[in-house]
């Protein structure tokens, strides 16, 4: 009877094995009951000395497979300080003295407490805790514009209007073209210019030192108006109902002319007769004032 070929279960490096049979050609009955990992010679003759391995409930003679040495070069990052391989030479032909010297150099280097310390040039490859410095918080420096210098204090995006002279030109007639220079400041009070409003003269600022043809003409007209008598209506301080008309003469004197008899009602007595002033008396009072109406202007009346 040819031996039956079987395969192991759960192994990566599986290879075919041949189970050992009894003298009568059957498998051992007690092989399935053997515990896992047992090396007992279950139902095997005394002449067999190969250790038995129970895998997946079946008895096999699998021996430990020794893999070939790795050809990958170990880097310093993969070697731990407590690893025994650092003290033993590997199969690459490294001498024991070189390994011991390297282990002494690594053990002598102090541990770094901070990750932001700048390492020495010879420790860049050996220090596994080295990290580059963080990005700078300044956005201009993080963009790489280190050579650009911007002076933001001297820039004035909103120029103020203080202490700046502005030229204002007033144009009404060809004779009144002049410039008024003003300085704006928050502390200066608001001042309104005094303007003379006349029919023939333009709007000009009153200045006693400024002599122009327009101002001379305006002063002449004002002098003529003052020489003419004018009638002004004033309210009396004694009573609000009575009105007194004063006539101004060329000499500057004013003569009151009462007109209360025209504005007030006649008084009625208990008998029903009304008391009226005689007309001759009022006419006599008007004629005694001796007013020269020839010099009065009809437009002012």
Swiss-Prot record:
GO MF term set: endopeptidase inhibitor activity
Positions occupied by motif D-box 2: 52-55
Compositionally biased tracts (Polar residues): 38-50, 88-98, 110-119, 231-245
Pfam family, one: Securin
Gene source species: Schizosaccharomyces pombe (strain 972 / ATCC 24843) (Fission yeast)
Region (Disordered): 1-55, 82-120, 218-284
Domain notes: The N-terminal destruction boxes (D-box 1 and D-box 2) act as a recognition signal for degradation via the ubiquitin-proteasome pathway.
Gene Ontology biological-process annotations: cell division; chromosome organization; chromosome segregation; DNA damage response; meiotic nuclear division; negative regulation of mitotic sister chromatid separation
CC terms in the record's Gene Ontology section: cytoplasm; meiotic spindle; nucleus; separase-securin complex
Motif placement: D-box 1: 33-36
Major site of localization recorded for this protein: cytoplasm
Gene that encodes it: cut2
Subcellular location: Cytoplasm; Nucleus
Protein name: Securin
Entry function: Regulatory protein, which plays a central role in chromosome stability. Probably acts by blocking the action of key proteins. During the mitosis, it blocks separase/cut1 function, preventing the proteolysis of the cohesin complex and the subsequent segregation of the chromosomes. At the onset of anaphase, it is ubiquitinated, conducting to its destruction and to the liberation of cut1.
């Amino acid at each position: 009877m040819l031996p039956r070929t079987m395969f192991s279960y759960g192994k990566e490096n599986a290879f075919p094995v041949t189970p050992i049979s009894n003298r009568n050609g059957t498998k051992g009955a007690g092989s399935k009951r053997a515990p896992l990992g047992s090396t007992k010679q279950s139902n095997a003759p005394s002449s067999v000395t190969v250790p038995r391995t129970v895998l997946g409930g079946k008895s096999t003679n699998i021996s430990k497979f020794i893999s070939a040495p790795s050809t990958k070069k170990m880097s310093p990052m993969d070697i731990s300080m407590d690893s025994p391989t650092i003290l033993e030479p590997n199969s690459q032909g490294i001498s024991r003295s070189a390994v011991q010297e390297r282990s002494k150099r690594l053990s002598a280097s102090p541990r770094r407490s901070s990750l932001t310390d700048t390492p020495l040039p010879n420790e860049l490859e050996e220090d596994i805790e080295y990290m580059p410095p963080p990005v700078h918080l300044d956005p201009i420096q993080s963009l790489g514009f280190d050579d650009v210098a911007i002076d933001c204090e001297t820039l004035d995006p909103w120029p103020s209007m203080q202490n700046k002279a502005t030229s204002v030109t007033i144009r009404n007639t060809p004779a009144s073209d002049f410039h008024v220079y003003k300085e704006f400041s928050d502390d200066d009070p608001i001042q309104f210019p005094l303007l003379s409003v006349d029919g023939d003269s333009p709007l000009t600022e009153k200045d006693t030192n400024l002599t122009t043809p327009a101002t001379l003409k305006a002063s002449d007209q004002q002098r003529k108006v003052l020489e003419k008598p004018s009638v002004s209506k004033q309210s009396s301080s004694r009573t609000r109902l009575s009105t007194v008309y004063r006539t101004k003469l060329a000499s500057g004197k004013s003569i009151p002319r009462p007109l209360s008899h025209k504005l007030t009602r006649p008084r009625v007595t208990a008998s029903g007769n009304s008391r009226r002033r005689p007309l001759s008396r009022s006419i006599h009072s008007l004629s005694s004032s001796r007013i020269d109406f020839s010099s009065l202007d009809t437009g002012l009346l």
